[in-house]
C-alpha cells in the first residue's frame, strides 16, 4: 500500500531542498514519481522536448532495464543499496523522475556526454558521470563500469532522450541560470528563509524526516546528506536548483536573493568529508574547493567547515 501525500502537505512543506514525495519514499513496491507542479522548473528554459510517458516503456527485456533505472532514480537506497552511503535518492535533485526540464533532466544529460569536466579534468563518459553522483551526492562508492546499476540508469536515460538530437547545449539541461545577487549571500538572512519555509519538512537541524526507517523528506546537511564533493556543495549550484525547483510544487516563488541566501545557509553547515581528501582541510580546499562559491575550508560562526577528519572508508 502506498501512502498518499496531499496537496496541502506539499503546500506546507515549503523550500525542502531535495524534497522527495512521501509517495515515492514509502512505496511498498515500485516507487511512484512525485507529481509535477503547475509552475515548474521548465518555465523559462526554452525546452520544447517532452520525454515519452512511462506507459511507453516497452514490455521486453530492454523495458525491464529501463524500469529498473527508473526505480533506482526514485528510491536509490533500496535499488542501489550497495553503492549508497546516505538517505538521498537521485530524484531529490532530478525531479519528476529525471524528466523535468530545468531540474537537471536525464534526457538532456544523456545527449551531452561524453564531455570534458573541469571537476576531474578529463573527458567523462555518461557512465563515469553517473559514478560521480554515487561517490559525491550519494556519499557512497562508484558502481563498476558496466554494472547492472549503471546500465539500468543509462538505459532509462537513453529511453527518456529518444528523439532528442545530440547537443551539449540542449535547452532544459541542468538548472536555469541565476545571476549573482545584488547583496552578497548572507547566513542570517538565509537562516530566516530556512526557518520560514524549510523547517517544517527538513527539521530544525536539516536532518529531514523519516517514517518507519524510510526517508520522507531528505536531510540537507549532517551525516546522512551529500558530502562536500557534491555539486550541491557549491552554493551557486544550490541556489539555481532552489530558485527553479523549490518549494516543492511552488517553483520560482522565492526571490533570487532568498534562493542565494538559503543556499548559503545550507552550505554553511557540516556534512560528510570530501572523499578526495588530501590529508588536511587546507590542502583539500586548495585542490578541489578553490572557489568563492564553496564554503569548505572557510570559517563560519567560528567553525572551520570540513574540519572533521578523513572520510570514512566505503
Swiss-Prot record:
Signal peptide: 1-27
Annotated disulfide bonds: none
GO cellular component: periplasmic space
Amino-acid positions noted as binding heme c 1 in the UniProt annotation, renumbered to this chain: 90, 93-94
Cytochrome c domain residues: 58-192, 185-270
Source organism, top-level taxon: Bacteria
EC number: 1.8.2.2
Single GO MF descriptor: heme binding
InterPro entries: Cyt_c-like_dom, Cyt_c-like_dom_sf, Cytochrome_c-type_DH
Keywords, alphabetical: Heme, Iron, Metal-binding, Oxidoreductase, Periplasm, Repeat, Signal
Compartments where found: Periplasm
Residues at which heme c 2 binds: 198, 201-202
Known role: Catalyzes the oxidation of 2 molecules of thiosulfate to tetrathionate, using TsdB as an electron acceptor.
Name of the protein: Thiosulfate dehydrogenase
Amino acid at each position: 500500500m502506498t501512502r498518499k501525500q496531499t496537496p496541502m502537505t506539499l503546500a506546507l512543506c515549503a523550500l525542502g531542498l531535495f524534497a522527495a514525495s512521501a509517495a515515492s519514499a514509502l512505496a511498498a513496491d515500485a516507487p511512484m514519481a512525485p507529481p509535477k507542479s503547475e509552475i515548474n522548473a521548465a518555465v523559462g528554459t526554452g525546452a520544447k522536448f517532452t520525454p515519452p510517458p512511462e506507459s511507453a516503456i516497452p514490455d521486453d527485456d530492454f523495458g525491464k532495464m529501463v524500469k529498473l533505472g527508473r526505480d533506482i532514480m526514485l528510491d536509490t537506497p533500496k535499488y542501489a543499496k550497495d553503492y549508497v552511503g546516505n538517505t538521498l535518492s537521485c530524484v531529490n535533485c532530478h525531479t519528476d523522475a529525471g524528466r523535468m526540464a530545468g531540474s537537471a533532466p536525464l534526457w538532456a544529460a544523456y545527449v551531452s556526454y561524453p564531455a570534458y569536466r573541469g571537476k576531474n579534468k578529463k573527458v567523462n563518459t555518461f557512465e563515469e558521470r553517473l559514478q560521480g553522483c554515487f561517490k559525491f551526492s550519494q556519499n557512497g562508492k562508484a558502481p563498476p563500469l558496466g554494472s547492472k546499476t549503471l546500465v539500468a540508469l543509462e538505459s532509462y536515460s537513453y529511453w527518456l532522450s529518444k528523439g532528442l538530437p545530440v547537443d551539449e547545449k540542449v535547452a532544459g539541461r541542468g538548472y536555469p541560470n541565476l545571476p549573482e545577487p545584488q547583496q552578497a549571500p548572507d547566513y542570517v538572512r538565509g537562516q530566516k528563509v530556512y526557518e520560514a519555509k524549510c523547517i517544517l519538512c527538513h527539521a530544525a537541524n536539516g536532518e529531514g524526516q523519516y517514517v518507519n526507517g524510510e526517508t520522507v523528506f531528505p536531510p540537507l546537511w549532517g551525516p546522512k546528506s551529500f558530502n562536500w564533493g557534491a555539486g550541491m556543495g557549491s552554493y551557486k549550484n544550490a541556489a539555481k536548483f532552489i530558485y527553479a525547483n523549490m518549494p516543492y510544487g511552488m517553483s520560482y516563488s522565492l526571490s533570487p536573493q532568498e534562493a542565494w541566501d538559503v543556499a548559503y545557509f545550507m552550505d554553511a553547515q557540516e556534512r560528510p568529508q570530501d572523499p578526495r581528501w588530501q590529508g588536511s582541510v587546507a590542502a583539500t580546499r586548495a585542490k578541489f574547493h578553490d572557489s568563492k562559491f564553496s564554503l569548505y575550508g572557510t570559517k563560519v560562526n567560528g567553525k572551520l567547515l570540513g574540519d572533521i577528519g578523513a572520510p570514512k572508508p566505503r
